[in-house]
């Protein structure tokens, strides 16, 4: 399978960092890179990140004051992109499932949602409201990296209200 680049923006995240990284390292896929981008932590977050990078060579640590999302995308070498915040990674097969869903369905985006399952190539959910349920949030989605090639400042697309139409067009 192709590599997944996982972009983890951090800022004073020492309380959650170990849980996040441990959850990633327990995933059933190994072909991944974990790109941690610190945007100016004033606590021990950056030191913790560097310690993790010495323990596992798939973990890369960067510092920037610029857009952490765009910075992470520029550093990513994988075919697929996952943005991660404080998501609980209780399912050790989450990345594997998301990647398989992308490949099997020739999709651009795979959305992880515990309320959905794929049954014989049909997506079955409790409810779907494309504007509210799938609006703008980066954190539970696996993207094909080439989806971002036509956007210069992807962080702005997902943060500003004026870009809502662009966000929706990505999912429709």
What are these language model-derived features?
Residues 38-47:
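A conserved acidic beta->alpha catalytic loop
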Residues 85-89:
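The conserved acidic donor/metal-binding loop of glycosyltransferases
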Residues 63-76:
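Glycine-rich, basic loop-to-helix element that forms the pyrophosphate-binding segment
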Residues 22-31:
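Short, acidic, metal-binding catalytic loop of nucleotide-sugar glycosyltransferases
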Residues 1-23:
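N-proximal low-complexity "stem/linker" segments adjacent to membrane-targeting elements
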Residues 127-172:
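Conserved nucleotide-sugar donor-binding catalytic segment
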Residues 93-121:
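Conserved donor NDP-sugar-binding/catalytic core segment of glycosyltransferases
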Residues 81:
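Short aromatic/hydrophobic "clamp" motif used to bind/position activated sugar donors
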């Amino acid at each position: 399978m192709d590599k997944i680049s996982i972009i983890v923006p951090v800022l004073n995240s020492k309380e959650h960092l170990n849980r996040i990284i441990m959850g990633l390292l327990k995933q059933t896929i190994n072909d991944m890179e974990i790109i941690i981008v610190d945007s100016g932590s004033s606590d021990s977050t950056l030191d913790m990140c560097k310690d993790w990078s010495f323990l596992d060579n798939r973990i890369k640590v960067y510092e920037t004051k610029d857009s952490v999302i765009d910075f992470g995308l520029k550093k990513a070498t994988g075919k697929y992109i996952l943005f991660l915040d404080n998501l609980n990674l209780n399912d050790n097969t989450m990345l594997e499932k998301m990647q398989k869903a992308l490949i099997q369905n020739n999709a651009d985006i795979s959305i992880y949602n515990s309320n959905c399952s794929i049954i014989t190539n049909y997506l079955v959910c409790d409810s779907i409201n494309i504007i509210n349920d799938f609006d703008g949030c980066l954190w539970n989605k696996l993207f094909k990296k080439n989806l971002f090639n036509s956007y210069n400042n992807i962080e702005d697309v997902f943060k500003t209200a004026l870009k809502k139409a662009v966000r929706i067009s990505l999912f429709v």
